């Protein structure tokens, strides 16, 4: 039987807090905030990684009752790790991503969801892990 050190027992995990229901008004714009968190001991590359071989943090929304116009990512930190010669642009702990949506005047009234995928590459202080996607689902009411 092979026993791995505890640092490998639990890999990175990014969780997204359940978003509050958002009211969208037809013909206007709305802002939606998503809060995500990485487990302790891990970081994710920022949306602007400092090395071209690293995979950026991205939030992509599926077109639906509203269209994503702008995503504001968390302000990254520059941190040095043993596996890199230079500091890396990363996010750690809990962080927010804010998206501005345009709601068409023709959007159907009623309840629904805005759906998207948050893609990230997590690392610890020794190595980076394969990228993962987390589904994001925001309940909305269109008026």
Where are the predicted features?
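Bacterial N-terminal signal peptides
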Residues: 1-6
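Extracellular/lumen-exposed scaffold segments
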Residues: 7-143
């Amino acid at each position: 039987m092979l026993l791995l050190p505890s640092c490998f027992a639990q890999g990175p995990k990014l969780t997204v807090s359940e978003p509050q229901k958002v009211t969208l008004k037809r013909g206007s714009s709305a802002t939606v905030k998503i809060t995500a968190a990485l487990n302790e001991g891990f970081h994710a590359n920022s949306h602007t990684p400092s090395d071209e071989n690293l995979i950026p943090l991205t939030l992509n929304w599926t077109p639906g009752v509203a269209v994503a116009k702008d995503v504001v990512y968390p302000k990254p930190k520059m941190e040095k790790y043993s596996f890199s010669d230079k500091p890396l642009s990363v996010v750690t702990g809990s962080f927010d991503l804010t998206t501005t949506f345009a709601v068409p005047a023709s959007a159907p009234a009623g309840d629904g969801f805005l759906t998207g995928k948050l893609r990230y590459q997590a690392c610890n202080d020794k190595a980076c892990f394969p990228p993962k996607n987390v589904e994001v689902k925001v309940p909305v009411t269109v008026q």
